[in-house]
Every structure is written in structure tokens, then in C-alpha cells.
Amino acid sequence: MFKIQESIFGICPLAFVVFAGVGTSAFTQADSPRPNIVVILVDDLGYSDLGCYGGEIETPYLDGLANEGVRFSQFYNTARCCPSRASLLTGLYQHQAGIGFMTYADWGEGYEGTLNEKCVTLGEALKNAGYTTCVSGKWHVAAHRNPPEHSLPENRGFDKSTVVRTHIDSYWKVLKGCDVYQDGTIVIPGNNNNKSLKNPYHPEKDFYTTEYFTDVALDYVDNALQGSDQPFFLYLAYNVPHFPLEAPDVTIGKYETKFDDPAWIAEYGRGWDEMREKKLARQKALGLVAADQKLPEVSYFNNRKIMPGLQTGFEHNALPKWNDLPENVKQEVLFRRAIYNAQIDNLDENIGRLTDKLKSEGVYDDTLILFMSDNGCSGEMGRFGTHFEGGKYDHTEARFENGKYIPGGVKESGQWPHNDKVGGVGYKKSNYDQWKKASGWATSQGQCWAAYSNTPFRKFKKFVHEGGIATPLIAHWPNGITAQGKIVSKQYFHFMDVMPTLLEVAGAEYPAAYDGRVRTPLEGVSMLPHMQDPNNDSLERLLFWQHETHSAARKGNWKIVTDNDRAESIKWELYNLANDRSETDDVADKHPQVVKELSGEWHDFARRVHVTPFPEKRAKR
């Protein structure tokens, strides 16, 4: 269990000032070189999966970084993979960088589906400031097919790059369409039939993405430190713990054993209901949430189609209670959670390999490490992670007619779990050897466990309620952050704040023009003053979100949010996050003026950054 450190809980008072296009001030320590910078991004990690955020998974290396650095309790992403990466890399809202939705189509400005030329990337800005720049892992900000040259890492400021340009749907294999590129050249071609791929760095070992991307990163660090006085910037973007469920057998077995251990169960509980309660208690003890924080009721979701290539999630019925499940189903879902935990455990081991390398090279204390997730935990494959729920669906698809949402009817049938890919009997613990490397959209832990991963928040990845957009953020820099073990909880921040933070750390300025092109001014603000002083509550700001049909705005403690921003008259929910980050008490009817003001701000934002007109109102280019 993560050691409880001194922490400070609080949320800033209601504020009404907008920060936009903020510049950076140079920051350098006296008689100290500029630090190396490592940004670690993971994929679909829940807010509270890590030990240092109250989770039960063993993450000693990440917990150590938190103990020696600071954690943020109110750090936000954009709710989805590609948009979050675009915001992180550019210091802008995702629409301003060209990726308002995903990378599968071009609907014009704001929705180009690829990184545009109106932004500056972290690679470009830090290379311009004298850093050696490198990226390893998942890129996913280039068009899915025929990406333009200006959207690729080798053309956006990275001296060295080893990436999968698109999504990654396997750990053990490199699937067709998921080729590995090194400096623009394919080095591992995708092949759906390759079941015995080996790690190029360790030919005696099977290929596994987490370990391979770490090997690449270690190689880059090694080369960057040889014969050069330049600091380095490493962007390490893992695909873990995104589905499918794939992890080393020995680590899976470790968690299977724990789930049957009476002492472990006494500390952490058994099943998602009891485990959520115990996790919330740990979060309160750590100072991550308010002492009176409550758990929300959680519901599962299905998708509704807006147009070809664009669908969105909508809530359905409540998730099942653990004690209502038959014992055989409990065993199946515990096994899925064991694999999920093993993926994160393995991630932590690999981050340990990186930090050990930095220590052995004598640069650990003067390297800024940031760790975060691109969105909340995913519930994309049903309640139990089988993709087909109870077997098969008989349903009438939800739809929009004249701006009005018409819910679909869903009726479940069949047996659980079921998937025709394994002889019609489903992906079960008993036949795991047959599907352990199935890859693709094979398996996940399901929405019941995902809700637990997102404790204490509502909803999941894709939504802009807190469960979809709240991410852990760990900042570690012994020579630059002295408030060790503290929690930055009085302010809220966003992915777009990483760019100005790193520029300040590097003593650099944001270029108003790059390669002769005028660039969009920064939207983010530097987090460095708050890393150095977690009590700093001087910042006042307004933030916005929009993804699929989900939208939100936050000003101080007030947050409005909706799952249907296409409605002729949007029904906004309103929450006071000072005492309700779980978003359980909608006070919109009690404070109509707040809703009116914030919704007006959101509409102004939507027009300014090209959220509107929405894609379905445009012609695909």
C-alpha cells in the first residue's frame, strides 16, 4: 500500500478570469544546467489504478516518483486518445491542433483528423531551444490513411522516432496497419499472422510493446548522453493498459493469488462494490479527495451513431452488483482484472528500468519526469469486457431526429461470456491459452471494473464527466521540486498546460512563428509555480471540453456538463466540484444564472476553436 505522505486538500474559490494565449517566462536555476525532460503518457489508465492514487495494483516505481515529487489531484485530459495527444503535444485545445474527434476522416477546420500546420509541437519547441528530442511509442495524431508529411514525428521536431503511427491493438504482435516506423521507415511491418515475433533488442524474448518501447527509450537516452552537452527530451507513449488484455503469465498469476488471499481481501476487498468503498477510504487518507466525498451510482453505456464514422456513448441501466453475480461469472471477471492489473504492474517495472538508467548515468536528480494518462479508464467493450455483453444484442439503434435524441431499445440474450472467435464458447479462463494473444478488439476488463478504476468519479473514457477526463499526474524533479510527497489540489490543470510548463523549465519561449508560418497562440499555463508550491492558489481560469456529443465547462468550482450537445436546447447538468467531484447532485435548477453564464462561455469557445459547426453539418473532405 502506498505510504501516506503529508498532503493538502482544497479547491480554489469561484473564479471568473479566462487565460488564453499565455506566454511563458524563462526559468533557470542558478549554477544548474537545464534539466532533461521525460514525458510518459499511458493509454486508458483509470484515475485511481496506481498505488499512490489509492489503487491496489503494485506500482512501487511510480509510487516512488510520487513520494519524491508531487501529485496532482485535479489534472484533466480531453477524454480520448488522439485529441489528448494533440493537446499535450501542442499546448492547445485539440480542435485548434486539428484533431477535434479522431484520425479517421477530415471534416474541415477543427476536425482535419491529423495534426495541422497551425501548431507547434513539444518536439519543435524544445529542439528549437537546444534539446535533443526523441519519441518512442504510440503517435496517433496523424491521419489513419495516407497521413500528410507534416503530421509525422520525424517532421515535427523529433530527432529520433520509433512509433506506431495509429492505434495499437496488440501487445504480443504488430498487427496489419500498426507497422512500427523508425525515423519514417518501417522497421517492423504489421502482420496479423505473426504469432512468434521477437524483441529486436532481446531476440531470446517474445515481443511485448511495453518492453519494446522501453528498450527504444533506453537506447535513445544512452545515445543522447554520449558526447553531448545538450539536454534531452523523451516522449514515451505506451499503449498500456488499453485493451486487449495481454500480459506476462507470471504477473497475471501474481494477482490471481492475491485475489484469493484472505489477508489481501481484508485490506482491499473482493469485487468492485466493496473494493470501491475501500479505495475511497484510502483516497481520503491520502488527501486526494475531500473527507466527505461520496461514491456515485454507476451505469453502463452503449453507443449511438451520429453519422458514418462518428458515434457517441449514452448511459443505459445500472451496472450489476457484485453479490448478484453467480460464482462462475465472478471467477471470470476476477481473471480479467488480474490480467489488467498485470499490464500495469509490468508498466511500472519498465518505468523502473528507465529510472534505474537515469540513476546509473547520474542524471536522475536533474531530469523532470511527468507521468499521465490520455483519458479515463475505458468501458468500450461492455459490462464484462466481452464486447458482446450477454451474448448478442437485439436492438433498435438510438438516433437523432430534428436535433432530438430518440433512445434505442436494447434487449440482451445469449449466454455469458460469448465470442465466436474461440469455437463459439467465448473467451474464458479455462481456454485462456487459445485467446491469450488474440489481440484486436478481443477483450477488456469491462465497465464494472472500469468504474472501479475511475473511483470516485462517474463515467468513462469518451465522456467529459470526471471519470472520462480526470487523470493522475506525477511530477518528479529532485533538483527543481522540493515539495516532496505533496499533492497539488488547490488548482486544476489540463494537458495543454504541459507545453508552457516545459518551456518555462527549459528557459525557452513559445515561437509565434515556426518554419515561416504563424502559429496559434498557446492556450495553456505553466504548472511549475504550483509544482514548487502546492499551496499556490493564485490561478484563476476557465476550461472547456468537447468530444463526440459530450461537452463541459469549468469555472472555479462550478462545472456544467452534457452528453448531448446536439440538442436544440441543451440540457446542462451543474455541479459544485468543491464538495461533489463525483457529480451526483445536479444543482442546475437551483443556479440557473450560473448555467446561463457558463453555457454562453462554452458556445463562444465552440465557435472560436471550430467545434461548431459539428461534423455532421459539414461535407467530408
Regions found by a protein language model. Name each.
Residues 2, 7, 11, 16, ...:
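Formylglycine-dependent sulfatase
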